[in-house]
Amino acid sequence: MRVAVSGFKGRMGHEVVKTVLREADLELVAVLDHEPKEKNINEIVEFSSLDVPVFGNLSEMLEEIKPDCVVDFTTPKVGYSNTKTILEHGVRAVVGTTGFTPEQISELRSIAESKKIGALIAPNFAVGAVLMMQFAQKAAKYFPNVEIIELHHDNKLDAPSGTAVKTAEMMAETREFVKQGAADEVELIEGARGSEYEGMRIHSVRLPGLVAHQEVIFGAEGQGLTIRHDSYDRISFMSGVALSVRKTKELETLIYGLENILD
């Protein structure tokens, strides 16, 4: 498959480029940066042996290169518009950018289906993180008192993380509604109890040195249960990205969540 990478200078995009180069059945045909200084990726020392054009305009890249799939790891500000542009050009998309609303996902799914092409948006491409979400969903049926703590590097732009939101959405499907905390609790400092989704509290930590981590903490009388996943390196996401790129060939719709393509 001929693959282009959008956001290739970001930490995740850089790792995706290296992954595409490692995979025998994937070919890196173009990369995209919002303000490129280079015309070819070989102007970067690490990739000096390659011949891959660098683009600053997504539509131009799609029309000139015609990739089979674009992997997008950019920012919430442009993630939706990028994905829409990719799909409207009839190109498959694998998107790790977060911040999509349910309405945006629905619209993008309609475009993918009208074009009969596959696409996948996932808040997390680590298989361990997907298992964490599935385990939490099962546990929430029996432990409705639950809070989420997500921890990421301090350059992450959105909060709470897409993984935390997806976890809460999945737990809400099996969990009896409980508004977490005392009915008359008072925040002495605004935001001390975190954000709220369906009565569950979500807390976001941003610190240097972290990559991506999440704890789902359940409490009940006389017992507690904690489900935690840690990504210590961005390589943890790459097997999921490569799997998703290949899977788009089999799809004619947009899938939200890596768990929906795992056997």
From Swiss-Prot:
Gene Ontology biological process terms, A to Z: diaminopimelate biosynthetic process; lysine biosynthetic process via diaminopimelate
GO MF annotations, alphabetized: 4-hydroxy-tetrahydrodipicolinate reductase; NAD binding; NADP binding; oxidoreductase activity, acting on CH or CH2 groups, NAD or NADP as acceptor
Annotated binding of (S)-2,3,4,5-tetrahydrodipicolinate, by residue: 153, 162-163
Pathway terms, separated by semicolons: Amino-acid biosynthesis; L-lysine biosynthesis via DAP pathway; (S)-tetrahydrodipicolinate from L-aspartate: step 4/4
Residue ranges crossing the lipid bilayer per the database entry: none
Gene3D superfamilies attached to this UniProt entry: Dihydrodipicolinate Reductase, domain 2 (3.30.360.10), NAD(P)-binding Rossmann-like Domain (3.40.50.720)
CDD domains: DHDPR_N
Catalytic activity: (S)-2,3,4,5-tetrahydrodipicolinate + NAD(+) + H2O = (2S,4S)-4-hydroxy-2,3,4,5-tetrahydrodipicolinate + NADH + H(+); (S)-2,3,4,5-tetrahydrodipicolinate + NADP(+) + H2O = (2S,4S)-4-hydroxy-2,3,4,5-tetrahydrodipicolinate + NADPH + H(+)
EC number in record: 1.17.1.8
Location within or outside the cell: Cytoplasm
Chain sites annotated for binding NAD(+): 7-12, 96-98, 122-125
Assigned GO CC terms: cytosol
Residues the record marks as active site: 152 (proton donor/acceptor), 156 (proton donor)
Coiled-coil segments: none
Pfam families, sorted: DapB_C, DapB_N
Described purpose of this protein according to its UniProt entry: Catalyzes the conversion of 4-hydroxy-tetrahydrodipicolinate (HTPA) to tetrahydrodipicolinate.
Entry's family note: Belongs to the DapB family.
The protein, known as: 4-hydroxy-tetrahydrodipicolinate reductase
